[in-house]
A protein has these predicted regions:
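N-terminal structured subdomain of primase-like DNA metabolism proteins
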Residues: 1-90
């Protein structure tokens, strides 16, 4: 289901893509934006499992992140996130 896909951990997804935080607290991390890689304007809330890119003015769930990172639509993002090689929430 879509709700199950949204539970995929954004932090683990970014780590699997080789994207690590520039600054981190127990509840969130600041990253170089995977959408617009110029400054550490990309925030991930680890508690809510949501992201926001202050430079691009966009944010949302892991589905939205995949859509923006790969310039694909909603259905393609769902298919992408259903790949067995991706990190899953236990």
């Amino acid at each position: 289901s879509i709700e199950q896909v949204k539970k995929n951990d954004i932090r683990a997804f970014l780590a699997q893509a080789g994207i690590t935080p520039v600054k981190e607290t127990p509840t969130g991390g600041m990253y170089l934006s995977p959408i617009k890689e110029d400054t550490a304007s990309f925030h991930v809330d680890y508690t809510k499992n949501l992201w926001y890119d202050h430079g691009a003015g966009v944010g949302g769930s892991i589905i939205d992140l995949v859509m923006h990172m790969h310039n694909i639509d909603f259905l393609d993002a769902l298919c992408y996130l259903e790949e067995p090689s991706l990190v899953r929430v236990q």
